[in-house]
Amino acid sequence: MPQQKKEVLVFDLNKTFYNKSSKDEFFKFVVSKKPRQAKYYLQMLYYELLLMMHQIRKTEFKENFFNYLDNLPPSQVEAYAKEFWENEFPQNFNKELLNRFKVARDNGTELFCATGGLEVYVKPLFNLFPISGFAGTQAEYVNGTYKVMGKACKDEEKTRRISKHYGNFGFTIAEAYSDSKEDILEEAEKAFLVEDGEIKPYPKNSKT
């Protein structure tokens, strides 16, 4: 008898489930612990400008934006992230989405977060809100800095990572939520765009 496909609800993190941008908020938190890391602020603005001008790839942006984590080993970043998310969850998360996700999970739908954030600081969140799967931008700590492994977890890379997670089991994206018009919304049976906390049905083939 063939295995039944997993029914999956996929969601983005930043400005979708989490009301803010975790990369910016986590920087503020790290600076509160290590004030010297504030020296990276102007550098971060520079790389954001390059990204907006399409002068830098998303993977290269991720690797350079997170230079503020330099000389902080994974164990330290994870400890900071644990405290950070304990301060943020659940009060700074989209309450309607939180309720939707809980209902879906109780009904047997698997929850999967696919985000461009670095896994090293995002992962501790899901000790507070358990889900079935998670994919973020992977990085390794080499000589005091974080180097992105492969591609940033954006666009088609999200789909690839979800497929890798489920392997031979097969899956159907029953619902997808994001704050941007991305590939994953086109692939879902039901897709929703989150704009300033408001959840709106996403019309297919509207990605520009």
What are these regions (language model features)?
Residues P2, K6, A79, E86-T208:
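C-terminal cap/substrate-recognition subdomain and adjoining C-terminal extension
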Residues M1-M53:
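Active-site neighborhood of HAD-like aspartate-dependent phosphohydrolases
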Residues E48-M53, T59-P74, F129, F134:
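Short, compositionally biased "basic patch" segments
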Residues F29-S32, E83, K190:
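Residues within well-ordered alpha-helical secondary structure of globular protein domains
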Residues P35-R36, Y47, I56, P74-Q76, ...:
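Conserved alpha/beta cores of soluble small-molecule-handling proteins
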Residues E60-E96:
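Metal-dependent phosphoesterase signature
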